[in-house]
Amino acid sequence: MKKPACIGRFAPTPSGYLHFGSLVAALASYLDARAADGQWLLRMEDLDPPREVAGAQAGILETLERYGFEWDGQMVRQSERHDAYAEILQRWFNHGLAYACTCSRKQLEGFQGIYPGFCRNAGHSPDNAAIRIRVPELEYRFDDRVQGTFKMHLGRESGDFVIRRRDGLYAYQLAVVIDDAWQGVTDIVRGADLLDSTPRQLYLQELLGLPQPRYLHVPLITQPDGHKLGKSYRSPPLPADQATPLLLRALRALGQPLDTHMADGTAQEVLAWGIRHWNADLIPRLRNIEEARID
């Protein structure tokens, strides 16, 4: 069977229920994949059990189904992928690419999130320590389909970053690179808050000899105070009975054409319309859009 030219994915975290910002990201990834006659995969990024909200995983699946989304194959849970992460982390540790870090948050205050390298050559045991990956003094750049060229000098703007936390939980940067490659994802469509994660992921892809996916970062939907809609800011979950109007609103946020008759359609009809008329070039070339400004 021929592999589809486009494989997209939606990868929510179960730290809360889906909200309007989640819907915009899910819709963009779904339409982009389906318009290319591609596959759309679903992955639950349940890497952080202490932050997981009881019932959120089931709620996310139910909401996606109510809003008409259909994914290909079985949903993948990152909590079931720890062996794959451990194998690669251990390989890097054995080859000196990764090292143990015992720095506390207090020690790192004042460095603006850029790791100063205190433990880089300390030779600490990995027990009861975070694991960091060594980064080169190089600039990584990529061409985003909406945001244009984005670049970051890993040494100056990131520093060696954590790939496994001190509590033993694997970091997002490691897991997402491994799983996107394992699932054959070719097109990553997600929120613009993850733009600065991408150069780190490009570096990990390089270390693993992986092909680079295409990237499209959609504008974040923000609150009046500038914070993105999100679970930590008590953004309201998507109501079960508002699929059609909220899908249409999400299409407007993405700059897509609308048919006035769609207001009376089902969620499935709105999605079908969106697939037929999808044009990523119409997505606003912005990092964020205030929710109140979406008509």
Curated annotation (Swiss-Prot):
Binds 1 zinc ion per subunit. Zn(2+) binds at C101, C103, Y115, C119. Keywords: Aminoacyl-tRNA synthetase, ATP-binding, Ligase, Metal-binding, Nucleotide-binding, Zinc. InterPro entries: Glu-Q_tRNA(Asp)_Synthase, Glu/Gln-tRNA-synth, Glu/Gln-tRNA-synth_Ib_cat-dom, GluQ/Sye, Rossmann-like_a/b/a_fold. A motif ('KMSKS' region) lies at residues 228-232. This is Glutamyl-Q tRNA(Asp) synthetase. It holds the Pfam family tRNA-synt_1c.
